[in-house]
Amino acid sequence: MRRFVLALLALFSLTAARADEGMWLLKLMQEQHLTDSLRKAGLQLAPEALYSENAPSLRDVVGRFGGGCTGEVVSPDGLIFTNNHCGFSFVQAMSDLKHNYLQDGFFAKSRAEELPVPGLTFTFVVRIDDVTARVEALARQKKYDQHTRQSAGVLAGLAEKLLKTSTLAKTPGVSARIVPFFGGNRYYMFFEQRYDDVRLVVNPPQQIAQFGFNQDNWLWPRHNADFAVFRIYADAQGRPARYAKTNVPLRREKWLPISLRGVEQGDYTMIMGFPGRTSRFLTASQVRLRCESINEPINLAGEAELRFMKSLMDSDKAASLKYAGEYMKLGNMVKNFGGMNASVASTRLLDIKAREEAAFREFAARSGRPEYRNIIERIDSLVAAVRDTLHDYNLLRFTYGAQDFHPNTAALSGFILRFAPRVQANWQRLDRGKKQIKAGAEEKKLYREFMTSAHRVALTTDFDYDLRKMKLLAPYWAKHHRLKAQPDFVRDDMNAYFDSLYAQTAFRDTAKINMYMATDYFEAFSEDPVISHWLLFDRLINEVYRPALDRYERKVAELNQIYVRGLCEMYGWTKAPDANSTLRMTYGSVRGYSPRDAVQ
């Protein structure tokens, strides 16, 4: 018997789903003839039950958990399910060695025991509008190129303006964001309502929730309880509100009932959520660039950093809790990038792309559209020119700049990389050799903020950890960077260099920090060894790599927009747009599979 199965999280499933290859935007169901395909696949619901802006639908029960995960409402009282790894960093931040909810788990026996989670939000999509014409009109008026019109700042400004004149302008908790689709050929504005009071209900113990840990990550079938349970709270009128004891569970008119019937071979199944990012419209050369100049250097440094962190975490319970979120985040990225490269090879994706490009060249010749001719070759030329620069840029970020990508770690190098640019940008132009740098009011304000942060860093940074990590990662840059770039970080004795750097910096001396806080001058900081080291890093990033990458991104945005438009025309606009952290749906049917010989 065929049954309709709505699968939003396959928490314990050992089955597989045979799916189509799209992450579909439900707003485009009619335009892309998706409803016919869904019915043929076995969907028994009306299309408006999936997505409707005028009546309750699945849009009302699937939301964005935190900044980018997916959750779903499974009760009329705001109970939500999500993946355990989605709540991982939030539960870590709530834990200490006495109440280690991450390692030991947590179970609220009543609503009174549910724990508020600082910083956690849950967001529902309220409406989606096509604003392509508005974006293009603004771009023509301001003479924006493709890169600029797709930039976050430009789109955020327009979204704010359009929200103010919309019917949702005064709805509590509603914001708007505009997102480019199909390589910048379409733009949609998402009206979203955010709830700020989300509380922890259930978190399985780590050994159960993360069984297999990164070895099983991105692989299926899975044998871990990768789930967590939270609840959304609102004020007495059901409006979004900050945490308050008087808040009540959010009442929802529609929710997902949980079925314990299981599934059978051939059952219809679908997934709704907020997938992060895909890049299915790339050329073969761009796929190769991603593999060789992004994934490979990041994996090289990332795997070394993971080994270093694990050795420390295995021997120290406090360190295990402190770095758990950072370790999971980095491990997830490394496994993803490594798996991506392996999949490109195993699926012979470059051969598939070559055939698609050949078909596109034939389409371009038939179309009579001059902008489509040689577009692939023009993209290939840009890629060839930037390949080594992009490789070294990523290698440098994840060796010398590794801490900057883990902001939850109060590490010295991360602090310098995040904050010092703001100070340097406001320094007056003068001879670096001067002992004192006189500053205006704005510079003095930044300096005070800088010194206050420096004092906090001096008290909280594990300098030995930071030093050991820098010594470990720096040689990877020395050995694997491709371009001869100046300034060069390679030293004859890297260990001695970093020992000297960390021994002499004022950031380790709270007395010096206090003394500097008492003055209005940037006294001596231009000569601090850590500042000097950061300035070398900054020069290499901003004077060598970023200008070349910015030129590439600006030029390739123009060409990608043309190429993706041509591909969509070739396919009759029947392809799903790339994932971009917006609400999507994919569907298929349940079936078993054999991942390797003798396993089914």
Regions found by a protein language model. Give the residues of each.
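Positively charged n-region of N-terminal signal peptides that target proteins for export
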Residues: 1-4
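Terminal presequence/propeptide segments associated with secretion/organelle targeting
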Residues: 8, 15-600
